[in-house]
């Protein structure tokens, strides 16, 4: 990656221009850098899917924000820059008490978790969930939010230290040393869980099906282990009346993203402001060290989010 000077973005009538103070680093950014994550047509090639900063300008049709507002936003791209144009419907006020760096770690993971766990997965208080990749940015968001909303939470992680870190929110299993399916069976008296949030994909498909309760929901949001599931157990799927679904965030329409933002403002912002959940920042790098930030995320050693900060 190279840092270059560019033009300050122009904004449309439904957009805001944000002076970026911090930006979140996400796996799609790494995939984009590697040429494995094609951008939607018409989107800037500059990476960066979430930012926090100060509103500089608002479009003619924007009434929810004014210059000077502290905001965080889910971008369509372009977050790795000092200035970013974002649809106003994907922009939210920074929750009280959070820094720019903390706020920059919110949008991508909270939008993703809300859309997949609560909208697609229909998880309800009193139900149970297994979160694969529990120490990732999405994972730490999911376990905290589900715990705060009254669900029983299980998670898989790759290090014993991460089991300890997640203990306030979830019962975690080291998938490198234990068979997670066997452990979940023991922990649930072989009843299984209501929802599984999966980032692994193909290799976990049948084991995930086996862990679902009747009417359970498997929500797939990644395929880090492979995108092909071989020999799918259709009988288990049918007998359990299971639902298998999945989604991406970047390809959603502006209206869909705005609807998610409104739900977050209503249901999740009060939890953030009350301290019942919080973005976990593993590391922060200045923009000049963006390569190191990517290497940190790519190492898999992180717990929570990696962010970059802008300097004048």
Report residues per predicted region.
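Short, glycine/polar-rich helix-capping loops at beta-to-alpha or helix-loop-helix junctions
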Residues: 79-82, 157-165, 229-233
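Glycine-rich phosphate-binding loop and adjacent beta-alpha segment
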Residues: 149-152, 157, 203-276, 309-312
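Adenosine-nucleotide cofactor-binding segment
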Residues: 131, 147-207, 259
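C-terminal capping/lid region of NAD(P)-dependent oxidoreductase domains
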Residues: 269, 274-283, 291-312
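NAD(P)H dinucleotide-binding glycine-rich loop of Rossmann-like/cofactor-binding domains
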Residues: 31, 42-44, 70-135
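Short, well-ordered loop/turn sites that connect or cap secondary structure elements
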Residues: 65-66, 123, 212
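Glycine-rich beta-strand-centered segment in the early N-terminal region that forms part
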Residues: 7-24, 36-78
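N-terminal Rossmann-fold NAD(P) dinucleotide-binding loop
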Residues: 139-140
């Amino acid at each position: 990656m190279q840092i270059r000077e560019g033009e300050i973005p122009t904004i449309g009538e439904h957009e805001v221009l944000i002076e970026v103070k911090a930006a979140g680093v996400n796996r799609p950014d790494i995939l984009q850098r590697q040429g494995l994550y094609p951008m939607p047509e018409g989107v800037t090639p500059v990476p960066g899917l979430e930012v926090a900063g100060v509103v500089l300008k608002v479009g003619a049709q924007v009434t929810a924000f004014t210059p000077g507002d502290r905001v965080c936003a889910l971008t369509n791209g372009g977050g790795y820059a000092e200035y970013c144009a974002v649809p106003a419907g994907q922009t939210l006020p920074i929750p009280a008490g959070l820094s720019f760096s903390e706020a920059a770690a919110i949008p991508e993971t909270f939008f993703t978790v809300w859309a997949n766990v609560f909208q697609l997965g229909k998880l309800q208080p009193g139900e149970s969930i297994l979160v694969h990749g529990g120490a990732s940015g999405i994972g730490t968001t999911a376990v905290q939010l589900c715990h705060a909303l009254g669900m029983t939470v299980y998670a898989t992680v790759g290090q014993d230290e991460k089991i300890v870190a997640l203990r306030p929110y979830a019962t975690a299993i080291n998938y490198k040393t234990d068979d997670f399916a066997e452990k979940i069976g023991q922990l649930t008296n072989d009843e299984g869980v209501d929802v599984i949030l999966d980032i692994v994909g193909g290799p976990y498909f049948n084991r995930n099906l086996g862990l679902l309760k009747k009417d359970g929901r498997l929500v797939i949001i990644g395929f880090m282990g492979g995108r092909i599931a071989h020999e799918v157990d259709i009988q288990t799927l049918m007998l359990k009346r299971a639902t298998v679904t999945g989604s991406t965030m970047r390809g959603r329409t502006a209206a869909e993203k705005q609807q998610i933002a409104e739900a977050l403002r209503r249901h999740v912002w009060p939890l953030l402001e009350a301290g019942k959940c919080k973005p976990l920042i593993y590391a922060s790098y200045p923009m000049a060290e963006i390569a190191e930030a990517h290497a940190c995320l790519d190492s898999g050693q992180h717990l929570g989010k990696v962010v970059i900060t802008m300097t004048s």
